[in-house]
Structure formats: structure tokens, C-alpha cells
Amino acid sequence: MSKHVAVLMGGLSAEREVSLRSGAACAKALEAEGFRVTTLDVDRDIAQKLAALRPDAALNALHGRYGEDGVIQGVLEMLAIPYTHSGVLASALAMQKDRAKDVLRAAGVPVAEGVTIGRFEAAKAHVMTPPYVVKPLGEGSSFGVIIVRADQTHPPQELTRDDWAYGDLVLVERFVAGRELTCAVIGDKAYGVTEIRAADGGWYDYDAKYKAGGSIHILPANLKEFVYQNVQELALVAHRALGCRGVSRTDFRYDDTPQGTGELVVLEVNSQPGMTETSLVPEIAAYAGISFGELVRWMVEDASCDR
């Protein structure tokens, strides 16, 4: 009898639409691999649904709050349902950008200087000399991220809006010029390094990430060999330092601009990276000869409650 897999998707976070796409792609691939699949759009009665369903494993295709921060992982452990990706602690750490940076810094991973501050304080005066970046502490997919440019005289007033939905604390972080790089870790091995560019030459924001034709992926990234290897090594160190399991993706900035310093810093570790067939991790896996079906099969076979 084929293994029964519950694909958890949708959810209650700002990244709901991205998660629905990840979940649908994973469910389709698992069915093609011979698994019996039930898709669950996660809401506040998910524990009851899972208890009634009793799947053999759960593939976590959730992104953002409640799905990527240790909450759903705790529910699955309480119900003794093996699940994919990282466990409770690693998920919570990776989702909280300031806490993750503390752990990475202690492990010797280079990160950009930053400070955690209330959003209203960050809107009163420049916290640091521009350019800098303002990020919500616990969101992904670039939701709520603000770039404060070098010529910007006033701090970002978007932070004071009544409809701000990303929490009252923000991370203000020094802007690092140069290229955006990313590296996937699958199991305990770092795979290919991709350079990501917004198709319009601008910032790699939500539209660039998820709209058709919004970004250009260069795989393998055109880097000197020692830089390429350094990215892979740091991705693996970051994955291990946070205690990640299964699949993760670490994002970097590399300053090789004409006046640059050659600085390479980790921006964040994604413990629940996008999982559509054209997302970065499946693309990197395919470059290594791992099909999307093989990837999701491995993820389910790797699922456990000891993460």
C-alpha cells in the first residue's frame, strides 16, 4: 500500500498564495511518484484535521507565520506525524531574523551589521547612515522590506501606516552592494550557487520573485572558484548552526562592485524555501541531476518527528 502524505499548504500568513503554489506543485509530483496524497489548506482547526486523517507523513509546504516558525512543527510532533524540513527550534530561529543573525555570527558566519528597533522609532530618524534596509523580524518573500537609499534624507514613513501588518519590531540592516546569491542545502550537502537578478534591473522584491519573467536566475553563478566554494561552505555552516534539517536555502550578498570590498555576507536562511517546479531549490536540484519528483520523494522519505 502506498504511503499516505498530507501536503500542508496555504495557511494564514502573508505568504499564503506562494504556499498554495508550492503545495500544489509538491502534491502533483508526489502523486506522480506513486504516493497517496491529501492536500490540506491549513487553518486554525488543522490539529483536528490531522488527528482525523492520520497520514503517514506531512510535507510542509507552508511559508511564513505559523508554518515556518515552529508552530506547525510543534503540532505535528504532538500528533506524532513525521514531517519534512526543519524542526521546532530551527524553524523558530531561522524565522526570527535578529536571533538567527546572533546564532550565525557566533558560528563565524559573516552577516551585515544591524539593530532591532521599534518601527515607530525607525520612522523618527535614520538609525544608521543610509543606505540601509528595514526588514520585519518574522516575514519572508520580501513582505514589508524597505530599501532606504543613500540620497534619502528622511527615514521611511511607511513604518507608521495604520495598515502595517508585519509587527512592531523591525531589523535595520546595513545595505550591502553587489550581487544576490543563493545556495541550497539538501540533506547535509550544499549544492549549486545561483545568482539572482531582477529582470528590470531593480530590487529583487516580491514581484521579481514570483511574477512570470520577474527575475533572471544564473546557474551556476559566474564566480571565481574560491568564492563559489565559500558560498557553499557558508550555506552548510549556516544550515548546521541553526539546526536545519531536510532542505534549506541560504541567501547572500556579494560585493564585487568596482569600488567594492569583496565582502560576502549571509542575509538569511530559509528553512521553508519555495517549492514550485521553477523555484530556486528545485532548479538547483535539477542542475545537480535531481528531478522535482525525486526531490519531493526524498523529502517525504526523510520525514521524521526527530528534527
From Swiss-Prot:
Cofactor binding, note field: Binds 2 magnesium or manganese ions per subunit.
Cofactor needs: Mg(2+); Mn(2+)
Localization annotation: Cytoplasm
Stored InterPro entries: ATP-grasp, ATP_grasp_subdomain_1, D-Ala_lig_Van_CS, D_ala_D_ala, Dala_Dala_lig_C, Dala_Dala_lig_N, PreATP-grasp_dom_sf
Pfam families: Dala_Dala_lig_C, Dala_Dala_lig_N
Alphabetical GO biological process terms: cell wall organization; peptidoglycan biosynthetic process; regulation of cell shape
UniProtKB keywords: ATP-binding, Cell shape, Cell wall biogenesis/degradation, Cytoplasm, Ligase, Magnesium, Manganese, Metal-binding, Nucleotide-binding, Peptidoglycan synthesis
Source species of the chain: Methylocella silvestris (strain DSM 15510 / CIP 108128 / LMG 27833 / NCIMB 13906 / BL2)
Domain ATP-grasp: 101-301
Record function comment: Cell wall formation.
Highest classification ranks of the organism: Bacteria, Pseudomonadati, Pseudomonadota, Alphaproteobacteria, Hyphomicrobiales
Known catalytic reactions: 2 D-alanine + ATP = D-alanyl-D-alanine + ADP + phosphate + H(+)
EC number(s) per entry: 6.3.2.4
Gene Ontology cellular-component terms listed: cytoplasm
Annotated protein name in UniProt: D-alanine--D-alanine ligase
Residues at which Mg(2+) 1 binds: 251, 268
UniProt binding sites for Mg(2+) 2: 268, 270
Domain of life, source organism: Bacteria
Pathway field: Cell wall biogenesis; peptidoglycan biosynthesis
